[in-house]
């Protein structure tokens, strides 16, 4: 059963008129409210420059407030919206903040709040993070009570800009008060990694170079950058999802056992393993950019008028990693991510070494697949006797498909889970400053090389293909053994994202 906490919390969403707020932040707050994890006494204030009324904002977000199955619950939606108001004001001058201060203080006085609990959510472009944080600190910070600030990615563009950003933020808010959101850390299967790895003797025992042949973290999206090309052109797939989301996944997958679930113990281990990553070898990558689909119905990346006509922006990358520690030394690790591919999925593939020959001549490797999305699942491809008289092997699976096993469970959306953590002050699933520093140190030399004058030309791959040419060979070179065509059959069709 849901627990209630802190009454009369004030949540202010900066950038409330924007896309992220509408699609993620408000729906997440609604989800928490619907499930009983947001106290009905909470006051939610949207703040942005656009001149909107309370009703305008409510109407804007209303279509996105749904139950997990997509159904509407008008009564709950209306209750929730009655907690929401809007205030228009600038980001870079005091006037709007002073008005906001008055609104918040009036609410807290009326409710007789001694120790304010204020959460500020910055759903804003990074160019104004610092302005807003400075104004917040000046005008809305109280010495007593709790103030927390959630900031959205990107946290910098490279090591230097991330360091500068951090140097400006640090004097304003302490690490305890800052919550750098990486929404992948709020996904159910990502949160499951620690428990699965360290809560199962058999997995824990096999999680090392003696047993594991290769590791892959895979991100595929079936759509391109349509409409976001201008933004994406200076970002590319490596900054967009690899340096942050996928590296977080890889870190949780490869770190040592923390002493407890305590946030700092977990984050200490993450930083430690990141420091053991070898520098990325510029020759150990495969990069691509999507062209038109084979039938010509889908545009190429360069067809987007908002991108440079000779852009070398990378929309697909496969990167080989090495971790120089006792557990992982010599195990090839591949992170691959691409837009405009044949399907949408995010998964982890751990392929185990072959069993000794002799008894067997040609028996497939075990493979553990953790599907983060869509349709969360964990399956272990293993070998078993085909039922019947013959003594033949068949590759089958130990299967945990969440929609089957956990039919009646509410699986929170990433933002629901993370906003709740921030309200409770739990930093476990947020990015710490030193983590950010090490991750940028790892990726910046590669980005400088790719974006520098001698940077290679990405291979063009057709929109909608499974992977760019060369990926099969790249994976094979990194220890991945492909199953023989037709040797493994899954009886159920996996829903497409
Ligand atoms: P697949 O056979 O789809 O893929 C295995 C791996 O080989 C993937 O990494 C895939 O890459 C790669 N690969 C294969 N052929 C190529 C190629 N031509 N080019 C590039 N890469 C290639 O997955 P599984 O064997 O794990 O499972 C088979 C099917 O069964 C899947 O649809 C899976 O979802 C389903 N299944 C579902 C379960 C569940 O829902 N609980 C349980 C077990 C199986 P890429 O990913 O890029 O295609
Ligand atoms: C965002 C990226 O951070 O993550 C997007 O900017 C990407 O380009 C998205 O599509 C993927 O998130 P999810 O939760 O849809 O897998």
Curated annotation (Swiss-Prot):
GO terms (BP aspect): glucose metabolic process; pentose-phosphate shunt, oxidative branch
Q: Where does D-glucose 6-phosphate bind?
A: 153, 183-187, 221, 240, 339, 373
Q: Which gene encodes it?
A: ZWF
- Give the pathway annotation: Carbohydrate degradation; pentose phosphate pathway; D-ribulose 5-phosphate from D-glucose 6-phosphate (oxidative stage): step 1/3
Query: What's in the GO CC field?
Result: cytosol
Under catalytic activity, the entry for this protein gives: D-glucose 6-phosphate + NADP(+) = 6-phospho-D-glucono-1,5-lactone + NADPH + H(+)
Determine the domain of life of the protein's source: Eukaryota
Give the classification, highest ranks: Eukaryota, Fungi, Dikarya, Ascomycota, Saccharomycotina
For this protein, the record's NCBIfam families field holds: zwf
Q: Which Gene3D superfamilies match?
A: Dihydrodipicolinate Reductase, domain 2 (3.30.360.10), NAD(P)-binding Rossmann-like Domain (3.40.50.720)
Which organism is this protein's natural source? Answer: Kluyveromyces lactis (strain ATCC 8585 / CBS 2359 / DSM 70799 / NBRC 1267 / NRRL Y-1140 / WM37) (Yeast)
Question: Record's Pfam families?
Answer: G6PD_C, G6PD_N
Q: What is this protein called?
A: Glucose-6-phosphate 1-dehydrogenase
What does the record give as the active site? Answer: 245
- Alphabetical UniProt keywords: Carbohydrate metabolism, Glucose metabolism, NADP, Oxidoreductase
Q: What does this protein do?
A: Catalyzes the rate-limiting step of the oxidative pentose-phosphate pathway, which represents a route for the dissimilation of carbohydrates besides glycolysis. The main function of this enzyme is to provide reducing power (NADPH) and pentose phosphates for fatty acid and nucleic acid synthesis.
User: Where NADP(+) 2 is bound, by residue?
Assistant: 336, 345, 349, 371, 379-381, 399-401, 466
Q: Which residues bind NADP(+) 1?
A: 15-22, 49, 153
Q: Mention one GO molecular function.
A: glucose-6-phosphate dehydrogenase activity
Q: What is its EC number?
A: 1.1.1.49
Query: Which protein family is it in?
Result: Belongs to the glucose-6-phosphate dehydrogenase family.
């Amino acid at each position: 059963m849901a627990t209630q906490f802190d009454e009369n919390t004030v949540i202010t969403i900066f950038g409330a008129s924007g896309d992220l707020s509408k699609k993620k932040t408000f729906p997440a707050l609604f989800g928490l409210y619907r499930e009983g994890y947001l106290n009905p006494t909470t006051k939610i204030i949207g703040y942005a420059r656009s001149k909107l009324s309370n009703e305008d904002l409510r109407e804007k977000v209303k279509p996105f407030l749904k139950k997990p199955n997509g159904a509407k619950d008008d009564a709950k939606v209306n209750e929730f919206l009655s907690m929401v108001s809007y205030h228009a004001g600038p980001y870079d001058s005091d006037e709007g903040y002073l008005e906001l201060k008055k609104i918040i203080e009036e609410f807290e006085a009326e409710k007789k709040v001694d120790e304010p609990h204020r959460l500020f959510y910055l759903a804003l472009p990074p160019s104004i993070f610092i302005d807003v944080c400075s104004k917040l600190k000046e005008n809305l910070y109280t010495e007593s009570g709790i103030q927390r600030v959630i900031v959205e990615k990107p946290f910098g563009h490279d090591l230097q800009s991330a360091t500068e950003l951090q140097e400006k933020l640090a004097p304003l808010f302490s690490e305890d008060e800052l919550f750098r959101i990486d929404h992948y850390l709020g996904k159910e299967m990502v949160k499951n990694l620690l428990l699965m790895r360290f809560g199962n003797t058999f997995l824990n025992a096999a999680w090392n170079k003696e047993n594991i042949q290769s590791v892959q973290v895979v991100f595929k999206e079936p759509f391109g950058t349509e409409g976001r090309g201008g933004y994406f052109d200076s970002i590319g797939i490596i900054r967009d999802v690899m340096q942050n989301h996928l590296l977080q996944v890889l870190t949780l997958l490869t770190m040592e056992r923390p002493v407890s679930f305590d946030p700092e113990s977990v984050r200490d281990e993450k930083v430690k393993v990141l420091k053991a990553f070898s520098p990325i070898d510029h020759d150990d990558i495969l990069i691509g950019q999507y062209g038109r689909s084979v039938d010509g119905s889908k545009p190429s990346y360069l067809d987007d008028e908002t991108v440079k006509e000779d852009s070398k922006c990378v929309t697909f990358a496969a990167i080989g990693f090495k971790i120089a520690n006792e557990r992982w030394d010599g195990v090839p690790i591949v992170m691959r991510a691409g837009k405009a591919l044949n399907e949408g999925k995010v998964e982890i593939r751990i392929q185990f070494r072959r069993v000794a020959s002799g008894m067997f001549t040609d028996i497939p490797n075990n493979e553990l697949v953790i599907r983060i999305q869509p349709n969360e699942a964990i399956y272990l491809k293993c070998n078993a006797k085909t039922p019947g008289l013959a003594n033949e092997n068949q590759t089958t699976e130990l299967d945990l498909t969440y929609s089957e096993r956990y039919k009646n469970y509410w699986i929170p959306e990433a933002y629901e889970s993370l906003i709740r953590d921030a309200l409770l002050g739990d930093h476990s699933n947020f990015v710490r400053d030193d983590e950010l520093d090490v991750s940028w140190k790892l990726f910046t030399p590669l980005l400088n090389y790719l974006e520098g004058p001698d940077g290679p030309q990405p291979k063009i791959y057709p929109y909608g293909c499974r992977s760019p040419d060369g990926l099969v060979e790249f994976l094979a070179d990194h220890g991945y053994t492909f199953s023989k065509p037709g040797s493994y059959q899954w009886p159920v069709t996996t829903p497409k994202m």
